[in-house]
Amino acid sequence: VSDNNVRFFDEEILPFVAKQYQLNLSTSGNDRCIVGGSSGGITAFAAAWHKPEAFSRVYCVSGSFVAFRGGHEFPTMVRKFEARPIRAYLTTGTRDMENVAGDWFLVDQEMDKSLKFSGYDYQFRIIDGGHGAGYGDEWQEAMAFLWKNWPEKVKAGPSAPRAQEILIPGEDWQLAGEGFKSTRGASTAANGEIFFADTSADKIHRIGLDGQISIFAEKTGNAHCVTVAADGSLYTISEKSGQLLRYDTAGKSSVVLDGILGHSILAHPNGSLYVTDNDAKKANNGGSVWLIKDGQKQQVDAGIKFATGMAFRPDQWLLSVGEGHSKWAYSYQIADDGTLTNKERFFHLHVHDWDDEAGAECLCYSQEGRQFIATKSGIQISADDGPTQVILTVPDKGRVTAVAIGGKDKDTLYAFCGNKIWSRKIQQHAT
């Protein structure tokens, strides 16, 4: 399920063969097809899935999409992740294999349903035969289908219905900025401007309504997070001094509170603030949530593995808190006095095969009620019922450390990825 094999093929095997035999091999996935059966079948599909720029055509015979090292997760991944530019031909046998890992005949049909659900360009054949059926008469049909209209490039399908409600056809990721050190803690102002911290560079930046990025404040004490309040002022926590700082719209700072080392901060429309922090002495349950109100700090929850980003549901009735060292984000009901009740590990997140945790970081909501969570797997999008419905990866497939929606029309999604920022127009709007 991981990308280990495709990196081995593309970065080691093929370059070695080309050099050893003095071959001029194309490096474009559009000129390549990868084929495999059984465990080789899922390996071939995983290669195209993780790196379509290396292999955009795949022939999968009796693919082992069963519970061997996470293979059973592929049908769900195909449904949730934005569709990728892959053309696939898959087969299964009516008397295919069955063992403790699962039933190949059934799971291959599940892959068929998932590929159809997400609009992939593919064909699926059920063959009267056993495990490995599909290498005979189907070969010619498979090759004709996989290579049709070549050299025209294979295009991604429309994605699943939930993704179609969010994405705009033809609107892909664009590089909005690069050269940063550690982008974190993005927050959107009422007018659609976005602010974020570049902690290692000791700066806070602003993304204007025209998409241009400028410095809002320098020498911030290594601001770790930012939030924009209802009055337009900006709050942050200094990693260096342990101070809660307020910046006015001109970028002038003042100290609000001393002795606070927070991971994330969130402003409530009523003027109060929520802060997450983590006690390093409590490795498995040191995360807390604090309420800052009338100059006083009150702990309103504890026992989180590693408390990270926060977001209000658009009606401010519920608060979500990321748990960075697990596959969850918490949901709380906000009481009238600002304290938190009805805590639940509610938002279940996808975890990469090679990761031990989802790595939930920054969170935000859209006006339409969808929650966007920055994770190691990309931006995971869910609704009020909890499960992740859509997962968006960025072009370099890197970890997303912060997420925000903003811009002139409040319909531009921003993904912050360490030293780069990506953006794309969507059918959702900032709160």
Where are the predicted features?
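Blade-level signature of beta-propeller repeat domains, shared across WD40, Kelch, NHL, RCC1
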Residues: T401-T431
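A short loop-to-beta-strand structural motif that recurs across blades of beta-propeller domains
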Residues: K203-H205, Q243-L245, G287-W290, W328-Y330, ...
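A short beta-strand motif characteristic of beta-propeller blades
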Residues: D172-E178, Q212-A217, K252-L257, Q296-A302, ...
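Short loop/turn segments immediately following the C-termini of beta-strands
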Residues: T199, E239, N278-A280, G324, ...
